[in-house]
C-alpha cells in the first residue's frame, strides 16, 4: 500500500520527505505551489501511511516505488524535490530513470555516500531506537533544528515529533539500513542534463556545511544557503518557498 496525493495542473513536481517524516511536512507549501504545478506528495516506504517492504529499504527501492506512482499517474517527466533522505531517493531515481527527470532540488541533502563515521552513527541509531523508541525519536527530531531555533519553534518541533512517532519501528530501521549503504551519486551533479538546486543550512547539525560545498565545485548546480539548521521547511519556510517557486519557473 502506497500513500500519495496528486493535485493541480502543469509541470509534475514530486515532493519527497525525509527520514522520520511523511508527506505532511510539505503542507505549508502545497497551497502556493499547486497554483501553477501538478504537485505529487508520496509517503516513502515504511513512513507515513505507506507500508514496509522489508527490513532494508534501499534508496533504489524507494526510487522504484516513486517510479511506480508516476507510472500509475501516467507522468513521464517530473521535477523531484527531496528533503534529506528524500534527496537521496531523488538521486537514486535520477540514476535509474534519467529520462523521467526534469530537474532536482536537494534540500538539506547530499549526493555523497555515508562516511564511516556516519555509518557508525546509523548503527548506533538502530540500537537506540530498538531500546527506547520514543526517546530516540524525540531526541532525533530536536537535534535536526539549529540550536537558536529550538525555543522559537518549540510548538512546531512538538508537532514534528508527533508525526515522527507515527513511523513504525520496522520502517525506521529499514530506512537507517538503506541510507547506510547508499551509493555516492556526486557524478549526477556533474553530468545531469537538467537543472539541479542544492539548499543547505549553515548551522545544519546533521550535514556539515563546508564539507557539502565541495560536491558542487565545477558543476552547474545552483546553491542556496540559509543561516539555520536541517529543517529549512520550518526554519526558513518563507525563503524556501521563494527558492522552490523560482526553481520551478526556470525548469
What would you call each of these model-derived segments?
Residues 1-13, 34-37, 71, 75-76, ...:
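Alpha/beta-hydrolase fold catalytic core
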Residues 3-55, 59, 69:
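Conserved HGGG/HGGXW glycine-rich cap/lid loop of the alpha/beta-hydrolase fold
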Residues 49, 91, 109-117, 147-148, ...:
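A short beta-to-alpha transition loop/helix N-cap that caps and shapes the active-site region
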Residues 61-78:
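Conserved acidic catalytic loop of the alpha/beta-hydrolase fold
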Residues 76-115:
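Conserved hydrolase catalytic core segment
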Residues 113-120, 131-191:
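Conserved alpha/beta-hydrolase catalytic His-Asp/Glu region
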Residues 191-228, 234:
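Conserved loop-alpha-helix segment in the C-terminal half of the alpha/beta-hydrolase fold
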Residues 234-248:
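Post-His helix in hydrolase/transferase enzymes
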Amino acid at each position: 500500500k502506497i500513500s500519495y496525493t496528486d493535485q493541480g495542473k502543469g509541470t509534475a513536481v514530486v515532493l519527497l520527505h525525509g527520514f522520520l517524516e511523511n508527506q505532511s511536512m510539505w503542507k505549508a507549501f502545497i497551497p502556493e505551489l499547486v497554483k501553477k504545478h501538478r504537485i505529487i506528495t508520496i509517503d516513502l516506504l515504511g513512513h507515513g501511511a505507506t507500508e514496509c517492504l522489508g527490513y532494508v529499504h534501499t534508496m533504489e527501492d524507494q526510487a522504484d516505488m516513486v517510479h511506480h506512482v508516476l507510472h500509475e499517474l501516467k507522468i513521464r517527466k517530473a521535477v523531484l524535490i527531496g528533503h534529506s533522505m528524500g534527496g537521496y531517493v531523488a538521486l537514486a531515481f535520477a540514476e535509474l530513470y534519467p529520462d523521467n527527470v526534469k530537474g532536482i532540488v536537494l534540500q538539506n541533502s547530499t549526493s555523497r555516500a555515508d562516511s564511516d563515521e556516519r555509518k557508525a552513527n546509523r548503527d548506533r541509531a538502530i540500537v537506540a531506537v530498538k531500546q527506547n523508541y520514543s526517546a530516540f525519536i524525540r531526541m532525533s527530531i530536536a537535534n535536526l533544528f539549529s540550536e537558536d531555533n529550538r525555543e522559537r519553534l518549540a510548538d512546531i518541533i512538538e508537532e514534528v515529533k508527533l508525526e515522527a512517532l507515527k513511523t513504525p519501528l520496522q520502517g525506521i530501521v529499514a530506512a537507517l539500513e538503506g541510507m547506510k549503504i547508499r551509493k555516492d551519486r556526486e557524478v549526477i551533479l556533474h553530468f545531469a542534463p537538467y537543472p539541479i538546486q542544492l539548499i543547505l543550512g549553515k548551522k545544519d547539525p546533521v550535514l556539515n556545511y563546508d564539507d557539502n560545498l565541495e560536491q558542487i565545485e565545477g558543476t552547474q548546480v545552483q546553491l542556496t544557503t540559509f543561516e539555520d539548521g536541517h529543517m529549512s521547511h520550518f526554519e526558513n519556510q518563507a525563503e524556501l518557498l521563494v527558492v522552490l517557486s523560482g526553481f520551478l519557473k526556470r525548469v
